[in-house]
Regions:
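Conserved, mostly hydrophobic/aromatic
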Residues: 42, 54, 89, 102, ...
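Beta/alpha (TIM)-barrel catalytic core signal, keyed to glycine-rich beta->alpha loops juxtaposed to Asp/Glu
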Residues: 154-321
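Active-site groove signature of glycoside hydrolases
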Residues: 141-156
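Short, acidic/polar
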Residues: 67-80, 127-140, 191-198, 270
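Acidic (Asp/Glu)-rich catalytic clusters
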Residues: 44-46, 103-112, 138-142, 200-201
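C-terminal segment of N-terminal export signals and the immediately downstream linker at the start
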Residues: 28-56, 63-66
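N-terminal secretory signal peptides
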Residues: 1-8
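N-terminal export leaders
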Residues: 8-26
Length: 321
């Protein structure tokens, strides 16, 4: 197969980038379609958000005061996100030192005002405990305002508790401490999806965050449609299914027909599938290298697959398992 049509893995991208530094000419299709990263509106405000952001679980959990190598690399990841057209960074108190790392890097870089910053609060606990946790997040992030506060892994055992927590978040929103509120959920189960639909219909959420990848597609059945119907913005995490998808395609070239939607790497292939669903506001893969961050952002450029092509993509990935 001609190199200009074969597609590249992320490791290939790094190798070819090194070759470029040595003066070699790279095949043009390695690069994504030109132009700005696609943006979509937050339904309740019509604020435009770039469709690719950055998740911080595990990757930003380190001591930024002592690990200078990781600090420099993550700093470059953030710079790449912002300079290449992204905005949203998602974190949580349960992500170890991730909030502290962001609280170190964002002010130092002078980019806090360019970032759409989202964090989370526990799904259970007293009003005082939840308030204390949110206040601690502000302290760790070294900011007095957040763009999005989310109830983390919302539960369905106690409807009154969830309502009380959302009321607390609404108070924070009314006071101007956060601009949007929402919930996250990570169970890939139909029963949980049904409850999420009920929650969106009952409560006027600004955002919902769910797991969604080509390996976990249960939210396609009802959740994403309900989000669109209720005016709820959607963030999707684990878009590579914790690298399961990259494992499935290891050693394989991106199929020629991926050129029809401007995907030149597997990362773009996987993300463009998700972004083709217009209910998805922003995907938030973790990125520990600037090259990966740039590749993720390139998924938001160029064409997206249509419904028939998405079915073909699923059939192809399924055939590899």
């Amino acid at each position: 197969m001609n190199d200009q049509r074969k597609g590249y893995s992320r490791r290939d991208v790094l190798k070819l980038a090194a070759a470029a530094g040595a003066g070699m000419v790279l095949p043009t299709p390695l690069f994504a379609a030109s132009g700005p990263v696609l943006s979509r509106p937050v339904p309740r405000s019509r604020e435009m958000l770039p469709v690719v952001g950055l998740g911080t679980a595990i990757i930003f959990d380190f001591d930024s005061s002592s690990d200078t190598a990781k600090r420099a690399e993550r700093r470059t990841v953030i710079r790449t996100l912002l300079d290449e057209g992204g905005r949203l960074i998602d974190t949580a108190p349960s992500y170890g030192r991730a909030e502290l790392t962001l609280g170190d890097l964002l002010p130092e870089m002078g980019v806090r005002d360019r970032v759409f910053l989202a964090t989370k609060v526990r799904a259970t606990g007293s009003r005082d405990a939840c308030t204390a946790e949110m206040q601690e997040s502000l302290k760790r992030l070294r900011t007095n305002k957040l763009d999005l506060m989310q109830i983390h892994n919302v539960g369905f055992r106690d409807r009154n508790e969830t309502t009380a927590q959302l009321d607390l978040l609404r108070e924070w929103k009314a006071s101007g401490v956060c601009r949007y509120i929402g919930v996250t959920h990570s169970q890939d189960q139909q029963s949980a999806n049904d409850r999420l639909v009920d929650l969106m219909q009952r409560e006027k959420l600004d955002f919902l965050q769910v797991n969604y990848s080509m390996a976990e597609r249960s939210v396609e059945q009802r959740v994403l449609a309900a989000a669109a119907d209720t005016g709820t913005a959607v963030l999707t995490n684990l878009p590579f299914a914790r690298a399961k998808l990259f494992g499935a395609v290891r050693g394989k070239a991106v199929p020629d027909w991926a050129a029809e939607f401007d995907a030149t790497t597997w990362g773009q292939f996987f993300l463009k599938y998700l972004l083709a669903n217009e209910a998805v506001t922003c995907v938030i893969p973790g990125s520990d290298k600037p090259e990966y961050m740039a590749d993720n952002l390139n998924a938001g450029r160029g064409r997206l697959p249509n419904a028939a092509m998405r079915r073909k993509m699923v059939d192809y990935i399924t055939s590899l398992s």
